[in-house]
Amino acid sequence: YMKVALVHDYIKEFGGAERVLRVLSDLYPSAPIYTAFRVKGSTCDKEFSDRKIVESKWAIILKYFNLYSPLRFLAPLVWSSIDLSEYDLVITSCSSFFARGFKTGKNTKVVAYCHTPPRFLYGYETSINLQRFWVVRVYAVVVNHFLRLFDYWSASKINNWIVNSENVKKRVWKFYRKDSVVIYPPVEVEKLSKASKEVKKENYFLIVSR
């Protein structure tokens, strides 16, 4: 009998990363989900109402007035407060809030499904783009240096890397010097149907996202 635990940044929105987490949870339905914090009643929380969710000791502080973004500097403390040493296998669904650096046992195997290294740490544009404000940029210069050290250190603790695209595979190698395997997020293709007529191609791209 293998003891399995799942880890995710936080339980709030139900986006693409959370859909992957749902599939992982369906594969291991008895595995508890450890997370930095959980917003009860949120769309994501409702999707995982049938699962055991374990919040970190810092959850109340992170949720208070929705301060988890400016309090990212607490991430090393948040994740180190979670002890997963009793598990044989830990699968972490990691992105902007790291979801790494937790305590593990000597024989614990850790697999990361990486949606992307934290975008705000490496100069990529984010959905909020708070660094357009000079105060945030000054704050980021100081804090992000230490978070990059934590990000690299916690990445070194992963046994196997899985990524969701070739682009993220390049980022994982660039920032962590780690090889990874691309496994695209699952799509229920049987629900799709072919177009009833030929689609005329025009000079634009259509992007659908939340």
For the regions a language model picked out, list residue spans one by one.
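Nucleotide-activated donor-dependent transferases that construct or modify glycoconjugates
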Residues: M2-F14, A36-F37
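Short hydrophobic "strand-cap" motifs at the C-terminus of beta-strands
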Residues: V7-D9, N164, I207-S209
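Short amphipathic alpha-helix
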Residues: A17-L27
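Active-site donor-binding segments of glycosyltransferases and PAPS-dependent sulfotransferases
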Residues: S30-A99
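Active-site proximal beta-strand in glycosyltransferases
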Residues: L89-T92, K103-F133, I162, V181
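Membrane-proximal helix-turn-helix segments that form the acceptor-binding/catalytic region
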Residues: L130-W161, K169
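Carbohydrate-associated surface elements
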Residues: N167, P186
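Conserved donor-binding/catalytic core segment of Leloir-type glycosyltransferases
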Residues: V199-R210
